């Protein structure tokens, strides 16, 4: 897996669409790509797509339609996968955002900041590389905990 992750990082760092852009408004102090699964993907990006498709299929099979559940009441009959890459500068971050057409979203980290290893061992409170779902107060006025 380490070799795959290294290859994926190199693929992203050399992707022709990786750039600083105001169009990608949720990336702060970092660069983002356009759609990676646009039909031209190859190498590690193609392998990533295959893994995601398999996992999404497994997830859907394990969570059948349930009319009494808000998430499972209307699952898609078929799905497609969209993907983009983000590379952050020091202290870069992803701003609060949402994926309106998405039924299911996920994140894959092929590389992590070194500080996360120390944080996992309880040696630092540095939040570099962390992810949090559900907190949207600065855009929507919601101050509740996720």
Functional labels for PLM-detected ranges:
Residues 37-47, 57-146:
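Catalytic core of non-heme Fe(II) oxygenases with the double-stranded beta-helix
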Residues 1-72, 93:
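Non-heme Fe(II)/2-oxoglutarate
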């Amino acid at each position: 897996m380490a070799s795959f992750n290294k290859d994926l990082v190199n693929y992203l760092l050399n992707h022709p669409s990786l750039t600083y852009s105001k169009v990608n408004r949720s990336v702060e102090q970092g660069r983002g790509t356009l759609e990676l699964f646009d039909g031209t993907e190859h190498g590690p990006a193609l392998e990533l797509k295959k893994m995601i498709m398999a996992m999404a299929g497994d997830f859907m099979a394990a969570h059948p339609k349930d009319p009494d559940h808000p998430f499972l009441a209307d699952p898609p009959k078929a799905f497609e996968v969209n993907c983009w890459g983000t590379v952050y500068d020091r202290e870069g971050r992803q701003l609060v955002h949402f994926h309106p057409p998405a039924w299911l979203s996920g994140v894959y980290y092929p590389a992590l900041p070194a500080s996360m290893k120390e944080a996992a061992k309880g040696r630092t409170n540095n939040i570099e590389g962390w992810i949090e779902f559900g907190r949207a107060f600065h855009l929507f006025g919601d101050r509740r905990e996720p």
